[in-house]
């Protein structure tokens, strides 16, 4: 399954990754606003969220008065983010794009975000360099990129399977168990994201 297809499929349920998504939106908005003010000043308000997802970071910043444009490879995720912004009456500008080729003009933003471990989805160091160069193209002089990534340890032997449980979530009146399963192949791993109703009915993942 491609990265785009994976996140298209996950978009309706992506909020279940968080124990309380609404609380996380507000908390991340506050944390990012503080980091932006600290590193780029209190007048840095034009933000490009180049890994928008369902809007976890963008919605929090919009609620704090930032001007946010969001882009993502997944049309399903962008559609969900647009809907969440409308519900909250927040002016999200959004588009579908690969962050290695962003259809925005150069030096248009104070800050570009790449959050929620988006950068490691790329296959090679060359792809990562291309993505970083493209994000830097989009920021004004004196601006910058803000990236959040998982703090990976050294990879285990090939074939190692790691199970990372998220616990139980309540959604639409039903309870679900969530977990990630990582199957390591050298320095990379195949990911399975499993969302299973407690009653055992089919849920996808």
Predicted regions and their residues:
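A short acidic, Gly/Pro-enriched loop at the edge of an enzyme's catalytic core
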Residues: 103-111
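SAM-dependent methyltransferase
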Residues: 149-205
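Conserved beta-strand signature within the Rossmann-like core of class I S-adenosyl-L-methionine
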Residues: 142-149
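Conserved class I S-adenosyl-L-methionine
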Residues: 1-53
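A short glycine-rich, Lys/Arg-flanked "PGG" loop and its adjoining helix->strand segment in the class I
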Residues: 129-141
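A short SAM/SAH-binding and catalytic strip from SAM-dependent methyltransferases
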Residues: 110-126
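Class I SAM-dependent methyltransferase SAM/SAH-binding core
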Residues: 56-101
């Amino acid at each position: 399954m491609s990265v785009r297809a994976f996140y298209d499929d996950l978009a309706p349920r992506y909020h279940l990754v968080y124990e309380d998504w609404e609380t996380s939106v507000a908390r991340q908005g506050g944390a990012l606003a503080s980091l932006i003010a600290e590193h780029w000043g209190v007048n840095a308000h034009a933000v490009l969220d180049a890994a928008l997802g369902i809007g976890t970071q963008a919605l929090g910043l919009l609620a704090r008065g930032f001007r946010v444009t969001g882009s993502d490879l997944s049309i399903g995720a962008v559609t969900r983010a647009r809907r969440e912004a409308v519900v909250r009456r927040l002016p999200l500008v959004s588009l579908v794009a690969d962050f290695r080729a962003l259809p925005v003009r150069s030096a248009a933003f104070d800050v570009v975000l790449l959050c929620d471990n988006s950068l490691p989805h790329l296959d090679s160091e060359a792809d990562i360099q291309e993505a970083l160069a493209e994000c830097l193209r989009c920021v004004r002089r004196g601006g910058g990129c803000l990236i959040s990534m998982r703090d990976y340890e050294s990879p285990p032997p090939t074939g190692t399977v790691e199970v990372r449980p998220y616990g139980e979530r309540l959604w639409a009146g039903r309870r679900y168990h969530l977990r990630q399963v990582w199957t390591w192949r050298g320095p990379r791993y195949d990911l399975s994201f499993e969302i299973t109703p407690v009653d055992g009915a089919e849920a996808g993942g």
